Amino acid sequence: MKNRFLEADLIIVGGGSAGCLAAIRALELKPDLKVVLFEKGDIKYSGSIARGMDALNIVAIPNFTTPELYVEAVSMGCAGILDAPASYVMAKRSFDLLKKLESWGVYFPVDKAGQYRTLQYHAKGRFLTAMEEPNLKTMIARIALDKGAVAVNRVMGLEILMDSGRAAGVAGLNVRSGELVVCRAKAVILAAGGTARFTLPNSGYLYGTFDYPGNTGDGYVMAYKAGAALTGMEFSRRTLLIKDANMPLLAITVTRGGRVMDIFDNIIMENECHSLSRMEEAFAQGRGPLRIKLSHLKPEVIEEIEHILFTTERPVQERFFKGRGVDFRKSDIELWPTECQLCGGHGMAGVVVNEKAETTVPGLYAAGDVAAVPKQHLTGAFVFGEVAAERAVQFIANNESVMLDQGQVKVMEARRNRLADTSGREIDVRDIEYKVRRLIGDYVVSPKNEYKLKRWGEWAERFRDELEKGVLARDGHELSKIYEVEHIVTCASLSATSALERKESRWGEAHFRTDYPARDDKQFFCHMVVAKGESPEHIRVTTKPVIGMDGKEVRS
């Protein structure tokens, strides 16, 4: 298997929402900058919005709502465990982002008075702003490429290259050929998404996940190995979605008057989407399956919902519902809890960053689902993609070139070759992934307790040994799957270790410990922070105080 060497000023890992916006912003600021993107899929149709999007979940529209109110609302949704400065910056920049998207041709509906269509999503304020853009991903990818960014498709990130404690580039793997792709760069932006393939979805399909199945925690693991801190990893989120399809629709249907009902026809949620814990409680109490009722709505509202669902984010829904014989005017939509995931966009897990998208490693920035800006959604990916680019461009201007650590590359090359050697290996990589994710569901996610979390530690050691010595890679694609499963195992260990130390229950089903069922603000009103210890297998856990709008520590 070959090696390929590249040079860049800035390398971005991940060509999704955050990655594309980072590339665009960097080249707006410095058009002659050499920007390279590593993308596991194809930049045109990859990431969590492979097609289009129906809304910006967070826009603080001037004279209508405020960034301060958004911070208050999202803090409530995070049970207080939220650093305000980053969320404030995101909300403050959100309206300018909307206007920028409009200038690119993105359509945001307005009423007869020229006001944007806003919907109730958060506990306070109407920040969710309707958008109808079925070609959003191809649009931002095209703009990034037109400005001069170079997309290296089919390459997953493996490690951050280091030079005297500073990020100095990225080494990745071509997911088809197994080629090692090494790019030296003066700054690195991680935008590689969360961990979608964490537990198994209820359908049983390995890749039938709610979020982009290419997201296997690559960015989390790269940051961790480079010495960066992560937080919120104990927040293992799942939601109730369309049964068997695992596609999102709550923010589209419920905010427009749809009703989430239990089997006794009690209304669980209506006209807002911030009460997800009530859905979890109803299902846990045996009042499921839950369903969304739309038949009571006016015909024009149902038509609007159909138009959005069938044309924008996941158009395959039209074929799915037709195949199931579901007509929203007559039939309800059945919901079911799906797989757990780790994610900074919908959840709280990610690389520790400040309001400047800076990690704890010089020259390394993070944006989007890989970054711990809780519940930032698409707005956060776009805003912090830009913020990361702005800081990276400034860092590049103020710092000298970096050296390529040939020793680090040789170690990676030797391991790649060892994993690709088929002799003595017979375990199918799909089989071990299934078992890994099944046991994550058994031991790592809620309901949690000390025994289960420690049992995962024992299994993780066994899985690491099997991945190193027994899993067969018949081609470059299967080789990339070995690395993906290894990343899933590492993410599960980070999650379990963090959950073990948070000896309380918080965030509903996202972190419920049967041995510590109560919330304990006195001891655990703080961030759990994990970082690499003496070796990658040794996870060090510390706590970090919650930071308020004034930059000072917040007490419960």
What are these regions (language model features)?
Residues 1-9, 22-25, 42-47, 100, ...:
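Glycine- and aromatic-enriched mobile tails/lids
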Residues 10-37:
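N-terminal Rossmann-like FAD-binding beta1-loop-alpha1 element of flavoenzymes
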Residues 14, 185-187, 191-192, 367-368, ...:
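Short, well-ordered coil/turn residues at beta-beta hairpins
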Residues 41-72, 250-252:
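Conserved N-terminal glycine-rich FAD pyrophosphate-binding loop of Rossmann-like flavoproteins
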Residues 43, 61-107, 225-232:
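Conserved FAD-binding subdomain of flavin-dependent enzymes
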Residues 45, 97, 102-187, 191-201, ...:
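Conserved redox-cofactor binding core of oxidoreductases
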Residues 190-247, 378-391:
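Glycine-rich loop(s) and the adjacent beta-strand/alpha-helix scaffold that form part
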Residues 222, 228-342, 391, 395:
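An anion/pyrophosphate-binding glycine-rich loop and adjacent beta-alpha core
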